[in-house]
Amino acid sequence: MRYIVSPQLVLQVGKGQEVERALYLTPYDYIDEKSPIYYFLRSHLNIQRPEIVKRHILLTLRMTQLKGYLGNLLDIKDDIIIYSHKNNLEYSYVDNTIFNPFVYTQKKTLLKNDSFLYNVYSGACDFLVIWVARACDTSIPEFGSYEDVDNNIIKFETMLMEVFPQLDLDITVESKFNNIFRTNLKLTGLKKIIQRVQDLDINYKSLLSRYDEHFINMTGNHFILNDEQLNLSIWDLDSTLALSSDGDTVMINNVKLFTDLVSDIDTQMERIKGDITYKVHLATPINSRIKLDIETSFIFIETATNNILLSSDKKISIILAKNHISIKVKNHIPNIEKYFTFLVIAINAMFNSVQKSSDFTKVETVYWSRICQNTKNKNRKPIIINYLDPGMKKISNNFYRSDEKEVFINDNGIMFTCIDPLGKYNKVGFLNIFHDMRKYCIPCCFLHDQSHRSTFSSCVHQIDVEKKIVSPYILNFGKVVTESKMSFLPIIFDAFLNDGMTANMEQDNKRLKETSGYHIVRCCAGDDIVRLRTISDIIQFVNEDKNILIVNDMIYFPMNATDIGKKIHILIQEIVHEVMIVKKKESSDKIDFFPPNYKLLKDLFPKQTIQTPIHSDAGMVLTTDGFYIDGKLFNEDLSSKYVTFTKNVIASDAVTKYFSPLFKYVISEAKDRFIKTWMINIMIHMNVDPNNIIPTLEKYYPNSGRAQIN
């Protein structure tokens, strides 16, 4: 889809608010008669032929910067007031009434702000109309001001208009919402949402669930509870979680669906945290290592990382890659992701269209002395020479070797070699970190031959390095691990799973040198990110995925021992990661991953694997390995036509006191609810003596896991 930069309208008005000039701003050479701006001109202002001006108001400007720009655009040297019929700009009333300098009232407090245009003008990416009046022509001339134009803004705009015809704005946008709000839905609101899902008949799966500290989980669509907290989950047709709520908070992934479901419910929502991540795919690749050659803080702010930019208000982050751009915003701003992508593509065309080779000496003061440094016993800094020794063997067009030395020639023709007075660091290699980040071939001196390294192959033989190469640096546990990274396990599990295993690290850092096998954390399992927010989400994931999951210091197993798979997952910041064994040879950069030793955790499973009947009645048998009806494992989904009731049961005082508040008033329509309410009834009927609870449980669940842990 090709992004069309919307036209903009600037209206200069006189004393009677009559339009003196109508400027139609566009980077194109024509009027788009189908645009909302032209419709507004023709239908509301009766202006058929405005002035076409090949300019563009940057939506990232502050109000003071905008006033300076508009004064320059209209060639006005007097104090001016800017306003709009649709949104408040530099002035607004305390009740957010639209400000008009010709119709001023002192009954309301007037506020002045210097915010960014895209924040104060809703929909500015698609429809921007700004009215400009000389302050002396209004009823409040004292509110006017004059601002000098920032020459950098004009310079940037001129360059933007020059490169615009060559920009490829064919883009495709994907979005992901992660919004969490504090709300007062409570049980009543959740039940209304369930009813609305059923009324809309949209075939979305909805589920109410309830769990306690003992992980007794109840699920279904109809509950009658006394002040008990519930969890609501709704999945769309692709089985993607659309929203999740416990009545007090709600996480929203599908904003439109949530809006439809609560249109008549007073949710009293208060944002806790929220963001939207847009992934914009580009038809034409860009240079991800962007560099701004003029002062452009009125658009983006550069960061220490070359491929990351921030918006001027630092609330929007932009991560650049060759073929796509990721934009993360705090609040929904219509089409801001497309507009920022347009600016990035333009800047790339202005300043970064050709990848320039970097001379090593230009980065010497930043990196050479820190990473490839000379110390008392190490001479790792290469030296520059002016010629090749006779008899040196040509390895490639930029690398020569003899028995005494190796020489690398960079793209600028500068020759580097390693001559260590101690005779140790004489092998030329390259710094991985800069090659991985920027494809820079920065030479450094090493103890051993580097020709087997992937970075060496790329710099010397121009062999493409695998894109998904994993960095040998191991992160501390706690951060989300990306595809090219790995991290340590939490201390308690690192000690347990890696007992008897070793990983040799380089001195003074966390770079893996060699290991014959060591458990670590890898990135998210599978192609899609799996986010588990509640205990109910965790239990459901484990039972469906049928693998072990580590959450904090707890281990979650599938309900049936025979279902336990060979994977180990671990939850970090609500995102599912994988535990794997890493292997690496000291002589190679290649890192291999293998399945974990899952049996170490499986042996802790607190339930015997030999099937033992617990109770049976009327052909229904509850065993330690599942629930059977007429000898057949019960694993079919129940239709919502079938409803089960948990009745009040006369039992011992201790059992009744514990279970009655939880299960006395429950009605449900789901398989899990049917099984668990039936099971609890059996437990209550058994009339277990409170003094014999532990021995009775150990009869059916003899392996608690404590013996293995101790």
From Swiss-Prot:
Coiled-coil portions: none
InterPro entries: Poxvirus_early-TF_lsu
Disulfide bond positions: none
Cellular location(s): Virion
Record GO biological process: positive regulation of DNA-templated transcription
GO cellular component: virion component
Primary subcellular site in the record, as a coarse category: virion
Alphabetically ordered keywords of this record: DNA-binding, Transcription, Transcription regulation, Virion
Domain of life: Viruses
A GO molecular function held by the record: DNA binding
Subunit structure: Heterodimer of a 70 kDa and a 82 kDa subunit. Part of the early transcription complex composed of ETF, RAP94/OPG109, and the DNA-directed RNA polymerase.
Family: Belongs to the poxviridae VETF large subunit family.
Function: Acts with RNA polymerase to initiate transcription from early gene promoters. Is recruited by the RPO-associated protein of 94 kDa RAP94/OPG109 to form the early transcription complex, which also contains the core RNA polymerase. ETF heterodimer binds to early gene promoters.
The protein's name: Early transcription factor 82 kDa subunit
Organism: Monkeypox virus
